[in-house]
Every structure is written in C-alpha cells, then in structure tokens.
Amino acid sequence: MNITTLTNSISTSSFSPNNTNGSSTETVNSDIKTTTSSHPVSSLTMLNDTLHNIRTTNQALKKELSQKTLTKTSLEEIALHSSQISMDVNKSAQLLDILSRNEYPINKDARELLHSAPKEAELDGDQMISHRELWAKIANSINDINEQYLKVYEHAVSSYTQMYQDFSAVLSSLAGWISPGGNDGNSVKLQVNSLKKALEELKEKYKDKPLYPANNTVSQEQANKWLTELGGTIGKVSQKNGGYVVSINMTPIDNMLKSLDNLGGNGEVVLDNAKYQAWNAGFSAEDETMKNNLQTLVQKYSNANSIFDNLVKVLSSTISSCTDTDKLFLHF
C-alpha cells in the first residue's frame, strides 16, 4: 500500500510527536543529578551514550519516513521515535550544561597550570574559548535545531495528518451516499447534502489549525519564510491575535464544495454517468493534492532529520576531539 491508499490505514491512528511523557523527563533529570553529583567524570560517558542513542533513533526515524508505505503502525513508530529524540536532546543539553559549569577532574599539577594561565587568549585576532564554553554553545545548538527546526516539522506533519485522517472518514462515508440512479444503469444518485455537510464540518474544524507555530504567533516575515519551507500549496499565511501563523490550506476542500454547488440541488442529485465521472475526476484530483501535500511534508521531515543527524555527528566528533586533546595535554 502506498501513500495514495493512506485513507484506509491511518483513519484511527494518532500522530503526536510532541507528546513526551513528563514523568520520563523527571526521571532523566533525577538520573543525571544522581550520577553527575556522585561522579562528575561520568557525565562525559553519559553524554556520549546519549548522543549515540539520538543517532540510532534518528536513523530508525529516517528509515520510517523514507518508506513509501505509511500505515497506522509506522505512524505510531514515527511518533514514538520523535518523542524519544526530544527526550534525549533534553538530556544531552543538561549534560552539556553540567560540563560547562563543573570542573573536569584533572591532574593536580595541570589544574594549577591552567589556573595560572590567562582566562582568554588571542590568536590572529580571534578570541579563543574554553572547552566548557564550547560545550555550552553546543548545548544551545542542539536545543535550537531541535526546537526551531525539527519540532516545526513534527508539528506540521502531525496537524496535516490529523486533517487527512478526518477527510479519510468522509471518503469512507461517501460510498454510502452514492447509489444507482435508475434501473438502466446509466445514472448515479448522489446525496449532495450529506457530503457537503461533512466537508463543511471538516473545513470549520481545520481552517484555523496552525501548521506553524504550534503555539502563539510570529511575524509576517517569519510566517512567510516557513510557508515557503513547508511548501507553498500546503498552507497559507493568516493573521491571528495580532500576529501571523501558517494555517492549513483548505483550498482543496473549498474546490470540492464548489463542485457540489455546480451540480445543482442540495438534496439527492441524479447524474448521468458522464457527468458523474467528470465530477468524480475533479473530486479525486483535490484528494490527490492533499495526499501529495502530506507526502511532501513527510519527505521534508525526513530531510530535517538528516540535517539533525549530521549535526549530532559533528557535535559528537567535536566533543570526542576535545576529550582526546585534554587527555594528551594532561599526559605528562
């Protein structure tokens, strides 16, 4: 089954990548405090393990997002792995913060030498920073790309998936609103009122649903930037509470409603086969637009995870290099 048959497989699924369990975070905080307070050097080991976990989970998430088959199970796995990454990112940031504030236990003579050195040095006019300052910057980088980039896509995919799930329910009901129009088999009877009501309810529910940001509002410039990033046909920039948001573009639903109005009548409408096929082709084209939008978002989310994975790889390498340098420096 590919993305075009998503309607039957995700109608009851719940994609909530930001639904991280609060008690899990508290447990992580407790574990970090207990371990680092009793043995500060272990925070480096914990950080290395956590970054490794992020990469492993992210690789699994990228594999799921690259699949052409999206099922209820795969969507649940995507949500689970997204939440796990968010929790591990939070843990990494805390560990990096601890490393930036606490002294790394080193050789006594080396510590005295370091304390006697200038706090800052100049090399070719560029300011040098300590490893603890570097780790603090790394912590900020991890948080920034997670909060301001990865989670934006998580929320956008979640919101659009929920909308399409509800549209899938309308499609499932459509079969019951179509019946033969006569005994000759040359006409079709369509319950226009029932279909129109379902589409209007869907539009009312999601017309103000934000793809970005998840909460509050942003500037018009920022909203336009993310509309372009997410895909111009997926959303639209609209005003809200004095600011701007990127809302779900409901144009496909609007076009479906217009096509029903063009059939004439608001109750049962009898269409000859040619007219029904023409209407159904237009209706299906709008459905295809929404499917393509969802597929585009999923692909962009996969690309965002690739960028995040590369960042974690670079940060892991940076931390390892710092640690190796410290070991060489203290080996005397």
Swiss-Prot record:
Effect of residue 151 to E: 50% reduction in hemolytic activity
GO biological process: effector-mediated activation of host programmed cell death by symbiont
Effect of residue 239 to E: In plasmid pINV_F6_M1382
Listed GO CC annotations: extracellular region
Keywords associated with the record: Coiled coil, Plasmid, Secreted, Virulence
Keyword Lipid metabolism attached: no
Subcellular location: Secreted
Biased composition (Polar residues): 26-43
Biased composition (Low complexity): 1-25
Region described as IpaB binding: 192-267
Chief place where the protein resides: secreted
Region annotated Disordered, chain positions: 1-43
Coiled-coil segments on the chain, per record: 44-77
Pfam families: T3SS_TC
The keyword Secreted belongs to this UniProt entry's keyword annotation: yes
Induction: Synthesis of this immunogen is repressed at 30 degrees Celsius and restored at 37 degrees Celsius.
Extra remark beyond the main annotation: Deletion of amino acids 1-20 abolishes invasion activity, affects contact-mediated hemolysis activity and IpaD secretion. Deletion of amino acids 41-80 and 81-120 restores invasion activity to a higher level than wild-type and reduces contact-mediated hemolysis activity. Deletion beyond amino acid 120 reduces invasion activity and abolishes contact-mediated hemolysis activity.
Family membership: Belongs to the invasin protein D family.
Domain note: The N-terminal domain is an intra-molecular chaperone that prevents premature oligomerization of the residues on the coiled-coil region that are involved in interactions with the needle and/or itself. The residues in the C-terminal domain probably form oligomeric structures at the tip of the needle that are responsible for the regulation of secretion of other effectors.
Known role: Required for bacterial invasion of host cells. Controls IpaB and IpaC secretion, and the efficiency with which they are physically inserted into target cell membranes. These proteins are exported via T3SS to form a pore in the host membrane that allows the translocation of the other effectors into the host cytoplasm. Along with IpaB, is essential for both blocking secretion through the Mxi/Spa translocon in the absence of a secretion-inducing signal, and for controlling the level of secretion in the presence of this signal.
Protein name: Invasin IpaD
Phylogenetic classification of the source organism: Bacteria, Pseudomonadati, Pseudomonadota, Gammaproteobacteria, Enterobacterales
Gene of this entry: ipaD
